[in-house]
Amino acid sequence: MGKELKRDLPDGGQIIMIQGAEEDNNVKLVYQGFMEELEGSNLEVVYEAHCKGWRAELAVDYLDEALEKYPDVSGIMCGNDDIAAQVVRVLAEHRLAGKVQVVGQDGDLAACQRIVEGTQTMTAFKSVELLAKVAARYAVSMAKGEKLSRINSSINDGSGDIPFCMLQPISVTSRNMDEIIIDGGYHSVEDVYLNVPRED
């Protein structure tokens, strides 16, 4: 998400972060990666909020408050695409939809529609098929007592470090929507381009 904002905002700008539940370890990992990606850029995080219990509707008040303080915001990092939906709605009310870069994650159909409509910049997509294939491969290897390959990270659950294979999400934008989402069979062309004509 940070990489996409850096690419789309080369001159820098103010960034708002509206994340998921603060106690969710995934939120902490995404935050860490996002901040590392922004290092050395002219992008400045000026406002941060967390949607308790991943309640996306909380983003409405957070963004209204943030826009009062920072009306010239350039980009908004959203914890997921549900939060991004609320953010885009508020931006539309302020006549800013499509003018402020919005990034989210999950690859929801509605997010894909917003991307081709121009109100959301990108979604970080995690292929369920790939996750299932990798999980099945590891399950078979473990059942056979084989050494696990490609373990590239670990996480501490309080009792010790648990090794795991971290898969990288795919940045889906209007540039690769057809290739990743439609050709991949995740959402149909008719559904993604429901509200706008598809450019050939």
Placement of each model-derived feature along the sequence:
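Hydrophobic alpha-helical
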Residues: 34, 47, 52-114
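Hinge/cleft segment of the Venus flytrap/periplasmic-binding protein
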Residues: 14, 18-26, 36-38, 134, ...
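Proline-centered loop/turn at the N-terminus of a beta-strand
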Residues: 14, 99-101, 122
